[in-house]
Amino acid sequence: MPFALGQRWISDTESELGLGTVVQVEGRMVTVLFPATGENRMFSRAEAPLTRVTYNSGDTVESHEGWSLTIEELTEKDGLVIYHGIHSETGEQVTLRETLLNHNIRFNKPQDRLFAGQIDRLDRFGVRYQCQMLRHKLATSDLLGLQGPRVGLIPHQMWIAHEVGRRYAPRVLLADEVGLGKTIEAGLIIHQQLLTGRAERVLVIVPDTLRHQWLVEMLRRFNLRFSVFDEDRCVEAYADHDNPFYTEQLVICSLELLRKKKRLDQALDADWDLLVVDEAHHLEWTEEAPSRAYQVVEALSEVVPGVLLLTATPDQLGHESHFARLRLLDPDRFYDYDAFLAEEDSYKDVAMAAEALAGNAKLPDAAINSLTELLSEKDIAPSIRLIQADGIDSELQQAARSELLQELLDRHGTGRVLYRNSRASVKGFPKRFFNPHPQTMPEQYLTAARVSSMMGGHKTLEAKAAQALSPEKLYQEFEDNSASWWKFDPRVDWLIAFLKSHRSKKVLIIASQAETALSLEEALRTREGIQATVFHEGMSIIERDKAGAYFAQEEGGAQALICSEIGSEGRNFQFASHLVLFDLPLNPDLLEQRIGRLDRIGQKNDIQIHLPYLEDTAQERLMQWYHQGLNAFELTCPSGHVLYAEFAEDLLNVLVGDDADELTNLLNHTQTRYKELKHAMEQGRDKLLEINSHGGDRAKAIVERLAQNDENTQLIGSVIRLWDIIGVDQEDKGENSIILRPSEHMMFPTYPGLPEDGVTVTFDRDTALSRDDIALITQEHPLVQTGLDLITGSETGTTSVAVLKNKALPAGTLFLELIYMADASAPKSSQLYRYLPPTPIRILLDKNGNDLSAKVDYASFDKQLSAVNRHIGGKLVTASQPILHPLFAKGEEYAQAAVDELVIQAREKMTTQLTGELDRLESLKAVNPNIREEELEYLRNQMQELNTYLDASQLQLDAIRMVLVSHV
């Protein structure tokens, strides 16, 4: 290489050193000073990994004094380049020797890096292009936000999330029956709102006991890192901000915290975008005296644009309580309780018409008359004739029914603010079978009970009942060895025998107390060596994850998982179908919660519920009340808490006493009341609401598309290559999973979201659903999103040189492949990406400037290319510069034309969609007051803003690949 003092070079291996200056040339060595860092490097003149930096006419360069020069001409003297051109500040003709160039110059533009010899590996160019394509595909998906969460693809859940999550500031009531996944629906909506930019700040208000469960659910299922706020956290946060709620974007807190005026005032002032309230049916309200808790939520709902209320079903709440929730969502719409009752009565005709349309028989005259009146502004006669006709294609008739149903849904009822699914309307639940196993009461327990009664002492009726239901706890009060009870308790003997006879089955065991769960694990381990693990509230999240993973493991995993009451909250184990209730809770809702650990949508087997109980004790009497009175073991009992509230005192007396007649009377009265409530609920079912809530065929279509995306092997390959390029260690763990760890040779110093000790991931949804410790990787996962951002936000893969070995083309033939990005700067909340997302535009030019991209696709072209080393690549670029410069200008012409066309298409799509939606909502507002004026105003403003952003769309060169034909 010809070196001269003062020449400017850059290091091919350490480009971060900036622009270097040759300071010594002696013998076979050259010394280069890098002023930006003050470091010297000595190289062999023959093999120095250096690239000479020279600029061309038209380029703008900066002097070390800070002024710029637009180059018009280059001359050379004594081996140094002198640049002639116009001074940026004075406009005068000036010269600038290369020695005086600014040493902090970095080559960020792809063409600058190419001409400076900063040429990247061929595979990195490919990964960069794939990353841009993945980002574009994700941004254009109408299912954005639904693919990534680690949840089962349940139609009604995906439907609700799809419908609600796309709205601006949604205000809805989620009132599904227990076990249908209200928390998942809320999480999906939150995830979608955050991912699409419709929301940035979210406040979740939950009961104290559910804060931890929500924290875990949001992290494990939705990769959302919420922070739990209590009084201590608020005090700590004062160091960072006067308002502690401003220190985090995603916050979970309890109602108790917000009962304090100071904290409520701070929450009201914290600019939330979305408010989520769990267990909202506990907010007590009457027109005369709303509770403090209700007032807290009401105050927040008045200042937060989006509100999600998770609540029990309206059937369970009663009309007044249900009205109180709707009033929080839209006080202008639901302003008077009597008016609400009158409106509900008018829904009966709508429900009758909907039920007729949902069936397959011809419509009765009453239904036709109702439809004609309800849809008076439309001509529905052709649809009615089609439905009533004989010998017509059934698909056409079904389409006509669906169209009329949709018209009803749009115009009537509370379908836009209320979603309620019931097990009666949602398929996919297993059957439940109850298996009672009576055991003889041990003498030790009888003795403990007698001693306790002799000692006397005042206890409440509920405390006495709890004591009678857990004789092992009473026994431990009189024994030094607290674990000795399991040595003689016949329930433990039965449990051991049961597990031994069902060795191939996974068994979930639930007990009330953590101490009981720990004792049972010890009993199984020491007496028979049965593999079991425990799960209780004293364990950390990581410990619980490990226990759950050990239980889920098919080979070498635990046969049994023993949970405490609180420890099992929020965890589901659908892969098991045997449930052992070691004792019974004194609350029907807790019993349903226990069974709900297995009885979820997605459970593939019927559930066998086993109850080993002690005969002639409170355990047997409570079992009879649950089974004979409520049928709570084999069916869900939505009225369970109502019945418990009505019969609690009688039940407690029966449990504490031993009166057979009292028990018989209690069972008879409970059965009668149970049937009355069940009948009332059946009569009150709103068919139209159910149809709207579960989504029908439209929901199934969404799930089918999501399932197809899950099977996309091309995505898996792209993500694996992405991690390979970045340098993430990947270890195959088996069972469809791999372990990702940071490596010492990673391209970037940190990989946000990748823990130092690694993380186990899978691309298989079923595997992720069965293992809490394995993350589900989709293109929405933060590890993928971060990887895409690391590559596309850096210079990785922006330049490349390759050889095409093709004897059909003359040797030396040049092709220039240019990847441009069409983009428009806009806030995420504007939703511009729906119409003009960051879009890669590929241009493939031959030496004459013809664009061959339409004839030669990327994949087939890429397969034919071979890499060249950086040094040779730099020489090829230098030799080709006279050809390349005009090709860049030609490529930009083609790309700009493509961008102009994209903007036209985006504007047409935006105008068509938003104008259509606006017209639809404006016409519906005349007949359905649930259409909010805020939604209409948002659409009008959005159209104006989007047109402004589209006018400012930009074109940017993202990556370059120069290709030369070789016959060697």
From Swiss-Prot:
One of its GO terms (molecular function) is ATP binding. The keyword Secreted does not apply. A motif (DEAH box) lies at residues 278-281. The keyword Metal-binding does not apply. Transcription regulator that activates transcription by stimulating RNA polymerase (RNAP) recycling in case of stress conditions such as supercoiled DNA or high salt concentrations. Probably acts by releasing the RNAP, when it is trapped or immobilized on tightly supercoiled DNA. Does not activate transcription on linear DNA. Probably not involved in DNA repair. Interacts with the RNAP. Has a higher affinity for the core RNAP than for the holoenzyme. Its ATPase activity is stimulated by binding to RNAP. This is RNA polymerase-associated protein RapA. The lineage of its organism: Bacteria, Pseudomonadati, Pseudomonadota, Gammaproteobacteria, Alteromonadales. The gene is rapA.
